[in-house]
Curated annotation (Swiss-Prot):
GO terms for cellular component: chloroplast; chromoplast. It comes from Zea mays (Maize). PANTHER family: PROTOPORPHYRINOGEN OXIDASE, ZETA-CAROTENE DESATURASE, CHLOROPLASTIC_CHROMOPLASTIC. The lineage of its organism: Eukaryota, Viridiplantae, Streptophyta, Embryophyta, Tracheophyta. GO terms for molecular function: 9,9'-di-cis-zeta-carotene desaturase activity; flavin adenine dinucleotide binding; oxidoreductase activity. One of its GO terms (biological process) is carotenoid biosynthetic process. It is found in: Plastid, Chloroplast; Plastid, Chromoplast. This is Zeta-carotene desaturase, chloroplastic/chromoplastic. Gene3D superfamilies: FAD/NAD(P)-binding domain (3.50.50.60).
Amino acid sequence: MASVAATTTLAPALAPRRARPGTGLVPPRRASAVAARSTVTSPTWRQRSQRLFPPEPEHYRGPKLKVAIIGAGLAGMSTAVELLDQGHEVDLYESRPFIGGKVGSFVDRQGNHIEMGLHVFFGCYSNLFRLMKKVGADNNLLVKEHTHTFVNKGGTIGELDFRFPVGAPLHGIQAFLRTNQLKVYDKARNAVALALSPVVRALVDPDGALQQVRDLDDISFSDWFMSKGGTRESITRMWDPVRYALGFIDCDNISARCMLTIFTLFATKTEASLLRMLKGSPDVYLSGPIKKYITDRGGRFHLRWGCREVLYEKSPDGETYVKGLLLTKATSREIIKADAYVAACDVPGIKRLLPSEWREWEMFDNIYKLDGVPVVTVQLRYNGWVTELQDLEKSRQLQRAVGLDNLLYTADADFSCFSDLALSSPADYYIEGQGSLIQAVLTPGDPYMPLPNEEIISKVQKQVVELFPSSRGLEVTWSSVVKIGQSLYREAPGNDPFRPDQKTPVKNFFLSGSYTKQDYIDSMEGATLSGRRTSAYICGAGEELLALRKKLLIDDGEKALGNVQVLQAS
């Protein structure tokens, strides 16, 4: 799930005063600087483009390129927006009937909006906020109370309350010291561990701290945290729910780099921990505006077209280049050609797409060492208000929505994070005369993948009642289950070096996706950032790609002439 540091005009620094829940993470915006030349990939540009928030690119002055993008998820669309802004021609090919990828949604026959997961926008999603502002979607986010809320069995509430008159890092320090989610001893040990982390260095040397964080990729967060004095209880009651919400795996199995990246951002950016959620469904309020921006500028979407084969050749001098893509839609087949090809896939998708021969390159072979994490998203519609804990009578009326309006964490259920979308994203999810729409993310999803939907729904219902005893007696009037076999890539210790760069050994073939190399974690922000990096590489190779286009035209012409001569001779 998702989701940056920000130059945002999206919302005020503090949310409106209404105590409610949250969860969070993300990176601070970098100081703006002028990007390097557009047609030359200089070391300066490469260095800058690896930042969490790259500077704005200069206006591209190279040749206009035709670019084909495989995948219309957030990474593919981010790439398309950047390329169209630089004057290129862009086509996006998506095998599904809807766009958005892991942040997509669709409407079923009964008019219900079905999401691929629960999407939360951390205050450090600078690149995503930049994209949303560019496409006119920045007003589609609702700011939540600046607290992260933990719902424990029996309906007791624990909080990390970041509301404080003074910003980072003091607002975070007081939140951790005052939290009622941990006992005094665990809070003290938690404070010691964080004091011994790169978080402290980040206050005076953010770049140095991030490098120190990168160097901790080989160790799990649990091992690192406990080696610094943290307790197992802190992990179980606080950090595991947060970690499951972010990457769908627990602290024992996640790289310390991932968690410490988030901590570093929280320590240096007041808004990093401030959560936002969409007004309604992603298809309407996120993907929709991006799609309109793309099509208004001449970009084209081709839905239900899947790429079956990457057609490539190797020149006598050993250089490999793509000559086209074989696409299919039902019984139709088509070969499309472009100057540059972008694979904006998830981990299982890129593994299926890459020609097996390309594994001779270490960069491509390393991709096969990555795998995705299974996740199950459940939606439950009730005939009352599940998260209303104060007033039983209010929880039974259906005239107005009541309850906790935020992202919620729990350590006491198989779903680590959840939200009542009828409250938190009401535009599409509040229905007059109906109650809560609980959307819960089951992590780890492995035990639930083989189960029938009815059994999954039954298990989740029981756990909801354990968290909210006051909801006993409410009925589920509608439900849905979405299973994704491989979602975010598994950010296990030692996996970061296997993430590929967006530029590949194949001259006109590029990668985009949140799993690719960038300084943020696999998330909506990571996907958006990868698209910016991909576009920068393509623009930097503009003259080279033009030369390749001319070479291929000559080669095709010579082959066609040769075929004619053969026919004439026969």
